[in-house]
Each structure stands twice: as structure tokens, then as C-alpha cells.
């Protein structure tokens, strides 16, 4: 576990954080430019010293200003991936990977190289690599130092769209397979949804919220960040069963099931999905024959009147699902808070 309880004055920015990060998974540090995201991970790495407080990683104290303890950066067992790859141009890819490598067997080396898809690049030099390839090598180099935590500072920000898509696939795989925590700085909603398990929401140096990605996404405090013309709901649901003949997977939603296109996940494994309100309609009675597979019972908990539509929040087995209907439909059907209804979900996006 990573414990951060620090204060730091950085010019006009007063950074303050008090969070505990579990020992696995991706914790995204999210916010606008200048909100203190990079400064927070630099405090963890030792590139910046706090004015007050402490940082502890597992059973080690990285810094404690009260007792004047501070481990040098090179002794903190931290892997750091910057926005730019920062590879040594005079070393091959293999040479870059082996630089700083500690206590790593050949089998582990081969595993990391295969995980990042860079086996065919080992004899090449950085000058001949694409931006995405350079970042994969930089990630591999960081992992091969045998770190207790991996810090990533917007590793996709300098890449064009095709390279971002390419690297994202490897990051998704990486986040599921390595057994150390990852602190991932980003201001991208797409990266947040696809990679993060938890989110630290920062604004003006202060941690505004810290929770699971689905709770942060669905909370009112996050609404201004989404900037959508419609509502959306993010749910993390366990796999209930697979239906191979139809290539479908059922996710457990309390006593009900949410069907999605088949995913390569084991029963019990959680899958993150996003449901947009434009893909949801509301009915009073469950139809007997319909092509829509996802029809779930719930209770209306919130109604918001917009310029050209009405948004309704329906609580389904403890999960809020938004639906958008026309004002005409609302005037005719008179939906009300507390009313039992069914939601028809036409599409579900798997993150």
C-alpha cells in the first residue's frame, strides 16, 4: 500500500493530498493542466520534497518531514515513465532495457519484452523507433528495475492518434498482468475509463475526490469534466456466465443480468461498461416479445428537465442508469420520482 499525506507549496499552488493507494491496479491522477498531478507523483519519486507530511510504500518510509527521513530517488524502488521516452540514443533497445536492470531473470526479461510486444525491436536504436515503440521500451525499462510501484506521467500525450491506440492496447494488458500499483497521470477521459481502477480528482492542488472510477464518473462532482450533451453511467460488474453460441456475456446486476458482446473474462471477473442515456428508454410494463435483450426493472430517483429533452435516473439494483426521453413522452406518460419502471438498453459500451 502507498500512503500519501503531504503538503507542498509550489509557487502559488498549495498542493495537499491525503490518500491510500492499494498494492495493485491503476490509480489515475486526473485534472486540468496545472492542478498538481505531476507534482504529486514527483513527490512520490523524490524529485520534489514535501514541506510537511510523509509518504510510505509498503513497509518503507520514503519521506517523513517530521523525523527528517528521506530516501534518495534511486533507493525508492520506483519505476518512472515520462511523457517523452528519454531513451539513450547510443544504446540499442536491448541496451536501454538492461540499463539499471536489477534482480531480473532471463525469463522475467523475456516476459516483459513479450508483454510489451518489443521482441523484434531489441537490436534497433531509438532513432529508428516510432513514438509508441519508444514509450513501450521506456515502460519495459522501468519495469525491469524491479520497482515496487510504477509512475506514469501522461505517457500518451506526445503521441498521434494511431500511436495512442497502439500503445493503449499494451497499457490495458499491462494493467491487468503486473502485480504492483500504477499511478497514472492523465487528463484524458478515454484513458481514465479504459485503464483506471480508481481516480484521484485534483483541482488547484487539492484532492477533490478519490474513489473507484465508476463512483467518480457517476458522481455530481465529475459532471463538469465530462462535457457531454447527454448523461452516461459507468458500471463495474462481475461476469455471471458466457453464452458461446450467441457470443454473448451476462454480467451480474444484483438479481438481474446485463448482456454484452462476449468478452475474454473469467466468471466473477469485473468488467467496466458505459451506458449512454440516448441508448436507454423507459417503459411502464415489461414487453413479452422484443428484440432488445436488456430490459431491467428499477425505480426513478431523479428527473432533470433539459432544453430539448428530459433525463431520468433509474436505480437498478443499486446502480444509477440514465435515460433520455422527449418532453412529449414525459408530458404524456407523467413519469415521477419513486415510480417503478423498466429500462430498455439498446447498446452497452465495454471499456
From Swiss-Prot:
Binding of ATP, residues: 31-38
What are the EC numbers?
7.3.2.5
Q: How does it sit in the membrane?
A: Peripheral membrane protein
GO CC terms, sorted = plasma membrane
Q: Which Pfam families match?
A: ABC_tran, TOBE
One of the entry's Gene Ontology molecular-function terms is: ATP hydrolysis activity
Disulphide linkage map: none
Q: Where in the cell is it found?
A: Cell inner membrane
Q: Which UniProt keywords apply?
A: ATP-binding, Cell inner membrane, Cell membrane, Membrane, Molybdenum, Nucleotide-binding, Translocase, Transport
Report the SUPFAM superfamilies cross-referenced here.
MOP-like (SSF50331), P-loop containing nucleoside triphosphate hydrolases (SSF52540)
Q: Which reaction does it catalyse?
A: molybdate(out) + ATP + H2O = molybdate(in) + ADP + phosphate + H(+)
The main place the protein resides is membrane
Q: Where is the Mop domain?
A: 289-351
Q: Which residues form the ABC transporter domain?
A: 1-229
The entry describes its oligomerization and partners as:
The complex is composed of two ATP-binding proteins (ModC), two transmembrane proteins (ModB) and a solute-binding protein (ModA).
Q: What is the protein's known function?
A: Part of the ABC transporter complex ModABC involved in molybdenum import. Responsible for energy coupling to the transport system.
Recorded hits in PANTHER family, A to Z, give: ABC TRANSPORTER I FAMILY MEMBER 10
> Which family does the entry's similarity section mention?
Belongs to the ABC transporter superfamily. Molybdate importer (TC 3.A.1.8) family.
Q: What is this protein called?
A: Molybdenum import ATP-binding protein ModC
Source organism: Haemophilus influenzae (strain 86-028NP)
